[in-house]
UniProtKB/Swiss-Prot annotation:
It comes from Streptomyces coelicolor (strain ATCC BAA-471 / A3(2) / M145). Residues 27-46 bind DNA. This is Glycerol operon regulatory protein. May be an activator protein for the gylABX operon. Transmembrane segments: none annotated. Residues 5-67 form the HTH iclR-type domain. The lineage of its organism: Bacteria, Bacillati, Actinomycetota, Actinomycetes, Kitasatosporales. SMART domains: HTH_ICLR. Pfam families: HTH_IclR, IclR_C. Residues 82-251 form the IclR-ED domain. GO terms for biological process: glycerol metabolic process; negative regulation of DNA-templated transcription. One of its GO terms (molecular function) is DNA binding. It comes from the Bacteria. The keyword Metal-binding does not apply.
Length: 254
């Protein structure tokens, strides 16, 4: 059995203590409540303070939870609300398209897959929740880069690797792709990330009309394309799914 790291256990206990009871606690209160020496408690508090998880009141010297915890908590709630709102619609999209469906959000310099619906057949498939995809070559990544200014900056700053001979890497060409994405309301990846694989994605917006994620389908090129072009009924299905999730998030009509 793996051994727990004592300092992390103590830090977690400290955060739980600050989250309950009085709004602010002094060093002595924290140390005595957790059975720690003052020096040990102070060292942990100082580290948590440096990371933004704990704040110290200048006047009283007492400690309280910091803004970084609020930011992390808000991110957690946003992602889980997005996934919850998308469950029914992504299942419908998988059934109507016959392809696998991915729901992605911006995470650092890539796309984090937060929901994955298998292609509705008997083929062997691997669950990809928690996987990362590049911003510059995938349909999900292009959508986020086109609509989210933060994702756009991350995509431009990242190392845009050429996965195939179709991958767009040059900044000017990439910007042109994003212009096209915004103009038509969806993004495509036809063998730009994986040989023989194509994907279509569209943006999801929240009640503030801010981009919060992207939804898309992925499958073999011969199934998603016809005579060298994306099948329009699949593009429409993806866009309809994105609009439906956006409406459920309070975005209104799109």
């Amino acid at each position: 059995m793996a051994r727990n790291i004592q300092s992390l256990e103590r830090a977690a206990a400290m955060l739980r203590l600050l989250a309950g009871g009085e709004r602010r606690l002094g060093l002595s209160d924290i140390a005595s409540s957790l059975g720690l020496a003052k020096g040990t408690a102070h060292g942990i508090l100082r580290t948590l303070q440096q990371e933004g998880f704990v704040e110290q009141d200048d006047a009283s010297g007492r400690y309280q939870l910091g803004a970084e915890l609020l930011r992390l908590g808000t991110t957690y709630l946003d992602v889980h609300e997005l996934r919850a709102r998308a469950l029914v619609w992504t299942d419908d999209l998988a059934r109507s398209s016959g392809e696998s469906v991915h729901l992605g959000v911006l995470h650092q310099q890539g796309v984090l897959i937060v929901h994955h619906v298998f292609r509705p057949d008997d083929s062997r498939q691997v669950l990809e929740i928690g996987a990362m995809q590049p911003l510059h070559s995938t349909a999900l990544g292009k959508v986020l880069s086109a609509y989210d200014p933060v994702a756009h900056s991350e995509a431009l700053e990242a190392d845009r690797k050429a996965f195939t001979d179709r991958t767009v890497c040059e900044p000017d060409s990439f910007e042109h792709v994003l212009d096209i994405t915004r103009a038509r309301g969806y993004a495509a990846d036809v063998e730009e990330t994986w040989e023989g694989i194509a994907s279509i994605a569209a943006p999801i917006h929240d009640r503030r009309r801010m981009p919060v994620g992207a939804v898309g389908i992925t499958g073999a090129v011969e199934r998603l394309c016809r005579e060298g072009e994306l099948r329009p009924e699949l593009v429409a299905a993806v866009r309809d799914c994105a609009r439906a999730v956006s409406r459920d998030l309070g975005a209104g009509r799109f």
